[in-house]
Amino acid sequence: MKKTTAIAAVCLACLTAAGCSQNTQAPLSEQPEQTTTAASLSTEDTTIRFTDQAGNEIELDRPPERVIISSIFPIPSVFALFRGSGAEIVGMNPSAMEAAENSYLAKVYPEILNADTSFVQGGEINIESVAALEPDLVIYSAQNPEEKALYDSLGIPSAAFSPAGQGFDCVETYISWNELLGDIYGDNGTAADIAAKARAAAKKVTDITDTIPEEEKPSAVILFNCANGSIKAAGTGSFGDYWITAAGGVNAAAEVKGHADVSIEQLYTWDPDILLLSNFVPASPDQVIKGENDTDLTGLRAVQEGKVYKYPTGFYRWYPASSDAPLSLEWTALHIQPERFADFDFPADIKTWYTDVYGLTLSDEEVQALTD
């Protein structure tokens, strides 16, 4: 009988091992010398030990060469950038593949499009299909702990990556994912380089927004989704709350938790100065302003004043944590505090980031298309 498990929707965002295992720890006398890092790569063998972001202690016989990323959707793009290739990803969630097909990820690492997605059907993981891909490691969301039990049942090594471990700070979350990859692959130097670039870019924004008086911060709401008569707003404990507050605004939806279902009446009560749409909202800002989406938001002050903006897709979707997180923070700040960021040359910053981080040279037209 086939075994399946449900995947939580983002995010966000989300076999017999070929020589890899999660064995119990050896006696101290048999262990290799430990370092001060969370993971250690033995000088006598290739055994790797690390702690994932759910607190699980993992042991692998060697660095994984066949990886499935099941339920934390930004990770394929983060993984490919960290490793300099998407070839090791043999399986990924269909939602992550959809993002890859419509982003710069596939342009930089086209091999990622070869990853299998059939092990997820209707939001369910088929463990037999996972096993058939013979992964050395499965990466899953720490918010889906039931996945670990499924993989453990067949001895499949797995590691949890968390979207929430850094208080939903998108820049620090992205950095923490790279640090965990550094532990897995014994490459903390790459992780440190990524962290330095991301923090330096984000600091340009927060050096300004950290000094803004509360009375000069406009209110904003991010709609995580708005379709088929359902409205989900980003409350406290969400990426959306981080974007708004770090960019110099006040989250009008802070009274709700996470990505919460809210009524149209509640949204009209909040009546924010600015309305932001995540990548998961089907409608465009123009459709919202013209009342062409299936939920009429035209009575909102932000809509009437044309202050409706949608997160772009670059190397990945810009609403969740991603390798474009510093750019996403700048983009949000430009819309929440436009006067304070009037001197920022955002198109130039995009070009610089894409050259320095991805090795891409974008034209003016490509930059315009990315942010439209």
Please give the residue ranges for each predicted region.
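Positively charged n-region of N-terminal signal peptides that target proteins for export
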Residues: 1-10
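Bacterial N-terminal signal peptides
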Residues: 9-17
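Bacterial lipoprotein signal-peptidase II cleavage site
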Residues: 18-30
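N-terminal low-complexity, Pro/Thr/Ser-rich intrinsically disordered segments
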Residues: 30-52, 56-61
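Short helix-initiation/N-cap motifs at beta->coil->alpha
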Residues: 53-55, 113-127, 256-264
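A short, structured surface patch at a secondary-structure boundary
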Residues: 70-132, 137
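Extracytoplasmic substrate-binding proteins
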Residues: 147-229, 253-254, 309-371
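Alpha-helical, coiled-coil/dimerization segments enriched in small aliphatic residues
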Residues: 232-259
